């Protein structure tokens, strides 16, 4: 039989391979979930701290660390409001309060991770936005509507009604659905994976390393929306679920020999959230030196109301408005990306913004894949305006992956 090409090599179909067996995994003997309780009291606004001791021979599976909370929303009437005079009412029985989307993560504005007392997570005060944007762009509709994201109280807001409270004439249906979970003072349980760089890589953490986590609370005015009351979230119980793996003695000895000569390597994809204030009344703004040093793989830009960002009970913090933007250009090392600036039109009469919308796919590496993010073309202009740019694809001509 002649070959298709002289450089083509011969192969064997797996259907004809009768004499080999699949390999057997022996390096990990077993694993189990361990629950850790916080070492601090669960005060209203106090940070929550966890410590995972590094003693023993078990390794930690960092990708499977999860936070579990049980909370209750307590509501009081605004001074001079229409309340009945009671000082505290279980959430939602007399006053209507709505939790914002992705509540488990919206409750925190910063998460610090320490390995042996050394900070390994970049400091920032916008963790809620990082978690929201990653979930919004990296998961398709099934994960958001019927799978694990609902465990974090993810319920995608209705476009065009992002700020419409439950007691509005036309309320946001997603707010209504989320409000049912805390109606009449019902306790709500939440669980989910934490969006931290060290938890987004596959390597186990070796033994002998103490892990300390510090979770800083967001303002209640940031994660609760309401009109005639002031509510607060009270954390009833908190647990950190950690998967510990028992490693075979041979692997432990081999690792110990290598660690006597060198250090363990943990390559990370670092995610940073940077915030800038654009003053009201300006028709144009140029922001220089946004990133100094190492070039980012990907940049995602969104615009929110400053009051919502800082916590306003009547505004949705995740309402990424278009603000009438008609020109957007990004420069990296003096090179414009893309070569022609984005010039969308968000006019009601003649909306033209498909190139900006398409960046949600080209900028996240899924534009040629059978994947999505549940943001339709119509939804985009009504609270989901994000501009995404894949710099690796531009400079190297290859995708940087998701």
Spans of model-derived segments:
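Short, low-complexity Pro/Thr/Gly
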Residues: 1-402
């Amino acid at each position: 039989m002649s070959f298709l090409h002289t450089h083509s090599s011969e192969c064997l179909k797996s259907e004809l391979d009768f004499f080999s067996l699949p390999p057997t995994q022996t390096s990990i003997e077993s694993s189990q979930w361990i629950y850790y309780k916080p070492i601090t009291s669960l005060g209203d606004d106090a940070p929550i701290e966890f410590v995972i001791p590094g003693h023993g021979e078990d390794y930690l599976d960092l990708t499977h660390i999860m936070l579990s909370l049980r909370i209750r929303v307590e509501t009081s009437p605004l001074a001079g409001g229409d309340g009945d005079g009671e000082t505290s009412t279980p959430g939602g029985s007399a006053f209507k309060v709505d939790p914002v989307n992705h509540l488990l993560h919206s409750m925190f504005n910063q998460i610090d991770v320490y390995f042996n007392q050394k900070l390994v997570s970049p400091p920032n005060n916008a963790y809620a936005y990082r978690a929201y944007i990653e979930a919004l762009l990296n998961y398709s509709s099934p994960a958001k509507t019927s799978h694990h994201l609902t465990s974090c109280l993810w319920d995608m807001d209705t476009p065009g009604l992002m700020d419409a409270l439950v007691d509005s004439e036309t309320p946001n249906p997603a707010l209504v659905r989320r409000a049912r979970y805390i109606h009449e003072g019902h306790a709500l349980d939440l669980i989910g994976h934490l969006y931290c760089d060290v938890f987004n890589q596959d390597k186990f953490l070796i033994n002998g390393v103490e892990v300390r986590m510090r979770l800083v609370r967001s303002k209640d005015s940031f994660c609760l929306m309401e009109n005639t009351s002031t509510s607060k979230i009270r954390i009833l119980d908190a647990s950190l679920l950690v998967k510990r793996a028992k490693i075979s003695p041979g692997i432990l000895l081999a690792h110990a020999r290598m660690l006597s000569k060198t250090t363990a390597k943990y390559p990370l994809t670092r995610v940073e959230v940077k915030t800038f204030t654009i003053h009201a009344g300006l028709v144009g703004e140029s922001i220089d030196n946004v990133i100094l040093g190492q070039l980012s793989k990907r940049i995602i830009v969104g615009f929110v109301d400053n009051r919502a960002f800082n916590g306003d009970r009547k505004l949705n913090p995740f309402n990424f408005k278009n603000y009438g933007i008609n020109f957007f250009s990004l420069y990296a090392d003096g090179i414009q990306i893309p070569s022609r600036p984005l010039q969308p039109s968000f006019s009601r009469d003649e909306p033209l913004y498909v190139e900006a919308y398409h960046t949600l796919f080209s900028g996240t590496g899924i534009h040629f894949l059978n994947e999505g993010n549940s943001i339709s073309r119509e939804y985009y202009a009504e609270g989901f305006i994000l501009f995404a740019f894949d710099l690796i694809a531009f400079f190297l001509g290859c995708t940087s992956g998701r």
